[in-house]
Amino acid sequence: STGTITRFRDTRDPKPRGRNIFWFYRPETLAEWLQKDKSLRTRLLDIPVLNEAGLRPAQIKAVKNLEQSFKKNKPKALIQMATGAGKTFTACTFVYRLLEHAKAKRILFLVDTKNLGEQAEQEFMAFVPNDSNRKFTEFYNVQRLTSSYIATDSQVCISTIQRMYAILKGEELDEGAEDTNPNESTWMEQQRNKKQAMPVEYSPKVPIEQFDFIVIDECHRSIYNLWKQVLDYFDAFLIGLTATPDKRTFGF
């Protein structure tokens, strides 16, 4: 670390290479990692072949390509699927596989409206993996954030990007801020006008290693400007989901 830029390299990785991190990890996190024989990036290589039963061709392609991207240690991936192609079901499928086979600790599912968060929660609650006859929620805890509290026993956290931004800023979220796309709401304008709206600073309550993966739903609306700070804060693989990417989205 130079005091301004901090880089980290895990020599247990298949092809160790440094990466920039927002802040350094907690000592207890490093101690926990040292007790494990394999790093997350090594465990990603151990993900078994996908069981294709019950999946559409587009869903199969998306999951396979995503996992191949992870195995190449690419930090970002973009999944483009047409509306109605089962984007959230696809997300449930690869989230399950990351938790079950790569032993991911916690995954953040980011949306930009409360309604989309509720829909995602219902999808996860109804999801039954094709290698089991039990529901996903019988294996893993799903929490939709309605306050700043992130349960320590949750494996999937669903949150609006507005709420996660407010959590990192240590601020209360305005009532109604999650009801509409923030880029079209007065709340976004209020944040821009605040003298201390930027930048996000390190929060000991939410360490950078809180999530191993971040799934960004409707990412064509949520990966720029104010919101990019949320994505840059965490040391996590990023997975963008969209049906309507633009040129900036492909640059993600």
Which ranges hold each PLM region?
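Acidic/polar loop patches that form or flank catalytic/metal-binding clefts of enzymes
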Residues: D131-F139, I239-G240, R248
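Conserved helicase motor
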Residues: K114, F136-S147, I161-A166
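Conserved structural-core and active-site-/substrate-pathway-adjacent residues in large, well-folded domains
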Residues: T2, Q59, G84, T113, ...
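Short beta-alpha junctions and helix-cap segments that line functional grooves
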Residues: F94, E123, N141-T146, N225-W227
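Short amphipathic alpha-helix with an adjacent loop that forms part of the alpha/beta core around
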Residues: Y149-I150, K205
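Signature of the SF2 helicase/ATPase Hel1-core->accessory helical subdomain module
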Residues: Q162-F252
